């Protein structure tokens, strides 16, 4: 199967895959950098709490302002451009949208976005892996009930791990363990958003140019990332949501105590 050939075919037939993107921050901008170079894909709209921030990220990855000049989703559909706004519900419910890419990095919001997309019959690519760590199987069940596809982003670590496991089993190798390792030293727990860039070998100016969020990157470093809490890994005691339960109902699968997680 050639994904590129299939996308070329859709482009030639004038029926591109129409995408709705929720969240145009650091991770969203990585995808935005690809879209102008990918045939057969039309980014119909972007929903972000900061439309101006989304436009700044689009400019950073090389988008021309004319590409996002649409005054509405209907206008974007008519002219093949992209609309930027704050109303994610309007974006998810638009009849022309084929797939929703959830890219907020906020696990609770991501669950709500996924459920709303399923209810509208939309496929979902969930880049917010923290949401999947908390209640991925339940989200997958809801997608199955709705008759749509729920997937993580291929290229991100969880999806690549699954791909490697599938490859190994197909080759006849027994897989006894699978996971993603990350270097962690005890003094990393002392990192704060004000000091984090030194651990990554970056200056604050370099991080700012790249649109990097110090709170988010600090959560990767100091052990307070939501994924660690979801899997009951040992993390620093200050993290209030350590061992937060994942409840039976996906709508209730939220942190029961306020935790520290950079968005």
Regions found by a protein language model. Name each.
Residues 1-116:
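N-terminal glycine-/serine-/threonine-rich beta1-alpha1-beta2 phosphate-ribose binding loop
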Residues 49-51, 105-106, 129-132, 155-156, ...:
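Short, ordered loop/turn segments at secondary-structure junctions
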Residues 36-40, 59, 63, 93, ...:
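Generic secondary-structure signature for well-ordered alpha-helical cores
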Residues 231-234, 243-247, 251-258, 262:
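Hydrophobic, low-acid, alpha-helix-prone terminal segments
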Residues 109-120, 129-148, 153-156, 164:
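Rossmann-fold NAD(P)-binding glycine/threonine-rich loop
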Residues 123-125:
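A short hydrophobic/small-residue beta-strand
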Residues 143-147, 151-225:
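Rossmann-like NAD(P)H-binding beta-loop-alpha module
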Residues 1-8, 205-230, 237-238, 263:
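C-terminal catalytic/substrate-binding lobe primarily of soluble NAD(P)-dependent oxidoreductases
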């Amino acid at each position: 199967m050639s994904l590129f050939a299939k996308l070329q075919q859709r482009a030639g037939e004038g029926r591109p895959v129409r995408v709705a993107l929720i969240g145009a921050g650091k991770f969203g901008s990585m995808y935005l950098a690809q879209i102008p170079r990918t045939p057969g894909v039309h980014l119909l709209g972007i929903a972000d709490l900061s439309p101006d921030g989304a436009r700044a990220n689009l400019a950073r990855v090389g988008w021309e302002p004319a590409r996002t000049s649409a005054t509405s989703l209907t206008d974007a559909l008519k002219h093949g451009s992209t609309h930027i706004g704050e109303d994610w519900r309007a974006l998810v419910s638009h009849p022309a949208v084929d797939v929703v890419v959830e890219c907020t990095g906020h696990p609770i919001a991501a669950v709500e976005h996924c459920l709303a997309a399923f209810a509208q019959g939309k496929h979902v690519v969930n880049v917010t892996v923290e949401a999947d760590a908390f209640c991925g199987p339940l989200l997958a069940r809801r997608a199955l009930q709705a008759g749509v596809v729920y997937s993580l982003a291929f290229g991100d670590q969880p999806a690549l791990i699954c791909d490697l496991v599938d490859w190994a089993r197909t080759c006849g190798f027994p897989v006894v363990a699978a996971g993603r390792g990350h270097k962690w030293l005890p003094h990393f727990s002392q990192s704060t958003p004000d000091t984090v860039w030194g651990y990554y070998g970056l200056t604050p100016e370099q991080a700012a140019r790249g649109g990097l969020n110090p709170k988010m990157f600090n959560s990767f470093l100091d052990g307070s990332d939501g994924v660690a809490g979801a899997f009951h890994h040992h993390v620093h005691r200050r993290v209030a949501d350590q061992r937060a339960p994942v409840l039976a109902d996906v709508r209730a699968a939220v942190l029961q105590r306020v935790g520290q997680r950079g968005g």
